[in-house]
A protein has these predicted regions:
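Structural signal for interior beta-strand "rungs" in well-ordered beta-sheet cores
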Residues: 5-150, 154-156
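Flexible, active-site-adjacent loop/turn segments at secondary-structure boundaries
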Residues: 87, 155-158, 165, 191
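Intrinsically disordered, low-complexity terminal tails/loops enriched in metal-binding residues
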Residues: 173, 188, 201-203
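Short metal-binding segments enriched for Cys and/or His
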Residues: 182-199
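Short, low-complexity, intrinsically disordered N-terminal peptides in bacterial proteins
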Residues: 1-8, 197-203
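Cysteine-rich micro-motifs
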Residues: 172-183
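Short, intrinsically disordered, charge-biased short linear motifs at domain edges
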Residues: 145-152, 160-171
Length: 203
């Protein structure tokens, strides 16, 4: 099917089952996706094949969710988040078959963070802006802005630029390995952008 009158300006593949409360203009929902009532999707998102989005999930603008990922109740993805194929979010710390929580823990993925293929995110964590979660990593605790995280349990092994490349640590000032002209300074609890664009789509 095309976007239809319910979601003007969006594209919905004819095999997708879509009952979301809202889908923004320019968003594309591909084959065999299931978007439940009570979910909300922003503008210009890419929801790839076989993605499941549950009631209560919220996606901002320009979000990409690759094939086979599941986004559950209590999970919010801010603008520009990238979710790799097969990423598994969880929303119940002590699950039992047939039991349901009155309120699910809130998991927040901040703007432009990226989660690599097969990463697992445990309930109630906050993943910071521009953070990069490596493929297969298990996120068990909050992650700082710009952190590069790998392993099980996930641990920070460095910092990444707005553009996604790893930063070169030169003391108080850090620079991008790719030479994108952004610079960073150390701040309490992590690093902060000191110069250059905060938009990954620009140099």
């Amino acid at each position: 099917m095309d976007s239809g009158s319910r979601y003007p300006g969006a594209f919905i593949h004819r095999t997708a089952l879509v009952e979301a409360d809202s889908i923004g203009e320019g968003t594309r929902v591909w084959a065999f996706c299931n978007l439940l009532p009570g979910s909300r999707i922003g503008r210009n998102c890419q929801i790839c094949d076989r993605v499941f989005i549950e009631t209560g999930a919220v996606l901002g603008d320009n979000v990409t969710v690759k094939c086979g990922a599941s986004i559950w109740n209590g999970i919010t993805l801010e603008d520009g988040v990238f979710v790799g194929p097969g990423v598994a979010f969880t929303n119940d710390p002590h699950p039992r078959s047939g039991s349901h929580l009155a309120e699910y823990p809130r998991t927040l993925v901040k703007e432009w963070a990226s989660l690599g293929a097969g990463a697992i995110v445990l309930p109630g964590v906050r993943i910071g802006r521009y953070a990069m979660i490596g493929a297969g990593a298990v996120v068990t605790a909050d992650i700082e802005d710009f952190a590069l995280v790998v392993g099980n349990p996930g641990r920070r092994i460095g910092w990444v630029c707005v553009c996604g490349e790893q930063l070169i640590d030169a003391g108080d000032v850090l620079g991008c390995r790719a030479g994108c002209r952004r610079s960073y300074r150390r701040s309490e609890g992590g690093i902060a952008l000191a110069g250059g664009s905060a938009d990954p789509r620009s140099a």
